[in-house]
């Protein structure tokens, strides 16, 4: 028995399903999860000592590659001064100022410890500020695991084949209106029927939790116009896309200004950090200034903040995103060319440092379309690549990530392995 198998068997006795986040269990692809022992640059090593080129990137945060020396040094330096204080620090002020500087839509920001906390509190803030109850979200978009948002959600719930979670009372989601992503007429109808009670619209401006799906032309602009007209709060969930697709996230690429933005992943540099922020008149409703409560023992944790500051400073260097985008586009195009050469039905898309792989003839534009992907073909491809030392997300419904550490040789090795893997699919 391999060391990975031994650890999974052992973990399954003490941890439900053997993992601490469902998609890690390999349920949708089969086989044994890889237990990671260490990581450096574009590579990870499992418990059996096997090396992989990693396109999971800790589900997005590792934009510089794993264990970047300057980030590690910042964490070590911060840790020597204390791990947690439960009191304000200068570093958390610096991180808040840097986020506000990078994202013009953010006039004020509050740090939390996860993306789920950020989206959960942004929803509460929108309701508290507007005095309204209903929220609009989109099918296949994932905004963390708070109860009111686990309705037709993406990410690991799609991997389970069930876009909603047990244990969520119907009353909790009675005020959640779930619509098709990229279907602006449906949103217009919802506002026509419920506009006076819609507190907010929350959206992944580029969806990354039902694989990668970009917004249709006019979709985000339409959401902005509807929210402005009806006095509702527009929330961009940029937990995944923030600082991953560009220096100002999707809002910078599109020029569309949300009222609130949620962040996590990249802003923590691999440590647990989340944030939400936006218009000052909205943020003034948060305690201790207002009556919308939010708190957290580890919010603004000094070690996590140090990692975030180091990461944001490094990715702010000129040319960083142009280079990252070019690398990601090369991967997506190269995989598509090799799949088609092998006669495999396949498409791919990319934006910034994110990419999507689809075993269907065209890039999907909706939750319904992405569900028509050939998941059996994905499983075979996933394991063929894993056997060759290339680590993709263990789900056909998750985006992938390229880092600054994925150099030309690493990308070429990936494409060479993919050529062999696609050939196996037609064998």
Curated annotation (Swiss-Prot):
Entries under Pfam families matching the protein: Aminotran_3
The GO annotation for biological process reads: protoporphyrinogen IX biosynthetic process
Query: Catalytic activity, per the record?
Result: (S)-4-amino-5-oxopentanoate = 5-aminolevulinate
UniProt keyword Protein biosynthesis present: no
Q: Which residues carry this modification: N6-(pyridoxal phosphate)lysine?
A: 265
User: Pathway involvement?
Assistant: Porphyrin-containing compound metabolism; protoporphyrin-IX biosynthesis; 5-aminolevulinate from L-glutamyl-tRNA(Glu): step 2/2
Please list the disulfide bridges.
none
Give a yes or no for keyword Isomerase in this entry: yes
Subcellular localization, as worded in the UniProt entry = Cytoplasm
Q: What is its EC number?
A: 5.4.3.8
Record keywords, A-Z: Cytoplasm, Isomerase, Porphyrin biosynthesis, Pyridoxal phosphate
Which GO molecular function terms does the record list? glutamate-1-semialdehyde 2,1-aminomutase activity; pyridoxal phosphate binding; transaminase activity
The coenzyme or cofactor needed here is:
pyridoxal 5'-phosphate
Subunit field text: Homodimer.
Q: Which NCBIfam families match?
A: hemL, PRK00062.1
- Recorded family membership: Belongs to the class-III pyridoxal-phosphate-dependent aminotransferase family. HemL subfamily.
Q: What is this protein called?
A: Glutamate-1-semialdehyde 2,1-aminomutase
């Amino acid at each position: 028995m391999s060391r990975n198998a031994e650890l999974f068997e052992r973990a399954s006795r003490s941890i439900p399903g053997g993992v601490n986040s469902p998609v890690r269990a390999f349920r949708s692809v089969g086989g044994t999860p890889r237990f990671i022992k260490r990581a450096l640059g574009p590579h990870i090593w499992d418990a059996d000592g096997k090396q992989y080129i990693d396109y999971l990137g800790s589900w997005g945060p590792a934009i510089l590659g794993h264990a970047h020396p300057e980030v590690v040094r910042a964490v070590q330096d911060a840790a020597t001064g204390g791990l947690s204080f439960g009191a304000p620090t200068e570093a958390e002020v610096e991180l808040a100022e840097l986020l506000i500087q990078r994202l013009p839509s953010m006039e004020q920001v509050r740090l939390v410890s996860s993306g789920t906390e950020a989206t959960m509190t942004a929803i509460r803030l929108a309701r508290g500020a507007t005095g309204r109850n209903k929220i609009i979200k989109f099918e296949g978009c994932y905004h963390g695991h708070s109860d009111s948002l686990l309705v037709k959600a993406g990410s690991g719930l799609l991997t389970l084949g069930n876009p909603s979670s047990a244990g969520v009372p119907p009353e909790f989601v009675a005020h959640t209106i779930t619509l098709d992503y990229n279907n602006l007429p449906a949103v217009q109808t919802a506002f026509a029927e419920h506009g006076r009670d819609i507190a907010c619209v929350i959206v992944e401006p580029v969806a990354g939790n039902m694989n990668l799906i970009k917004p249709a032309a006019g979709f985000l602009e339409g959401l902005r116009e509807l929210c402005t007209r009806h006095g509702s709060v527009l929330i961009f969930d940029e937990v995944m896309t923030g600082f991953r697709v560009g220096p100002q996230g999707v809002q910078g690429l599109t020029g569309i200004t949300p009222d609130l933005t949620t962040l996590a992943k990249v802003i923590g540099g691999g440590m647990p950090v989340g944030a939400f922020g936006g218009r000052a008149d909205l943020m003034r409703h948060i305690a201790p200034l207002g009556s919308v409560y939010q708190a957290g023992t580890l919010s603004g944790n000094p070690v996590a903040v140090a990692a975030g500051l180091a990461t944001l400073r490094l990715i702010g260097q000129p040319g960083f995103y142009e280079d990252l985008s070019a690398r990601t586009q090369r991967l997506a195009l190269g995989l598509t060319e090799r799949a088609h050469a092998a006669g495999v039905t396949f498409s791919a898309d990319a934006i910034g440092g994110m990419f999507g792989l689809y075993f269907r003839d065209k890039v999907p534009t909706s939750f319904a379309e992405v569900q028509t992907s050939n998941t059996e073909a994905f499983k075979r491809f996933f394991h063929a690549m894993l056997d060759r030392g290339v680590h993709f997300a263990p789900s056909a419904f998750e985006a992938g990530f390229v880092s600054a550490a994925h150099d030309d040789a690493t990308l070429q090795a990936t494409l060479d392995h993919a050529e062999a893997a696609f050939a196996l699919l037609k064998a």
